[in-house]
Structure formats: structure tokens, C-alpha cells
């Protein structure tokens, strides 16, 4: 996973494995906001570990820009965070994301 500090309080992450998927973190004085998660668990866990170790703030919110697995399936790695998304994003996660996740679980 690639990581870059974009500005004083903004970090950019990019998957090394899947489709150059990107995610971001906006850091405040007491907590952080994650914008999308990465495609693979190891990469999203790497983001989380970086935030906890290097930035020393909890993630309070995760914003999903859309429902695709490579942007939203990592939500589960931020259990204390509130997930924010458009209502249609939630509907599509339920309609399409949940069946896709079940299929992936059966295949692995």
C-alpha cells in the first residue's frame, strides 16, 4: 500500500494490489475521518494501524463514497466509527453488497 501526506491533516492511501483503489484520512485534534477503505483487509488494517500508531487519534467516522466492495467492505475494521454514506449507498450495500460478500465468503 502506498501512503502520502497530502497536507498537514490529510493522508492519501492507494492499494498496491487492486485497481489502484484510493482512500483518505482527514485528521483533527481529537479524532480522524476515513474516506473509503481499501480493497483488501490487510491494506485497510494497515491504514488503521497507521492512524492508531502514527496519528494517535481514534477514527470517529468512515465516509463511503459508494457501495463497491473495494471502498466499503473495510468498514468493519473501524468498529467504533459511525459510517456515513448517501441513503442509496446503504440500499445498494444491502441489495448487492451483502450477496457479493456471502459469495466471497463461500469461495474462500
Tell where the protein language model's regions lie, with residue ranges.
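Intrinsically disordered, low-complexity boundary segments flanking structured domains
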Residues: 1-2, 70
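Surface-exposed, flexible loop/turn segments at secondary-structure boundaries
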Residues: 18, 70, 89-91
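Active-site metal-binding motif and surrounding structural segment of the metallo-beta-lactamase
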Residues: 29-31, 42-85
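Acidic/polar short surface loop at catalytic or gating sites that assists cofactor/ion binding
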Residues: 85-108
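Residue-level preference for alpha-helix termini and adjacent loops
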Residues: 9-12, 58, 77, 88, ...
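Generic detector of leucine side chains in alpha-helical contexts
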Residues: 38-40, 45, 55, 92-93, ...
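Conserved beta-strand hairpin/beta-sheet module of binuclear metal-dependent hydrolase folds
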Residues: 3-50
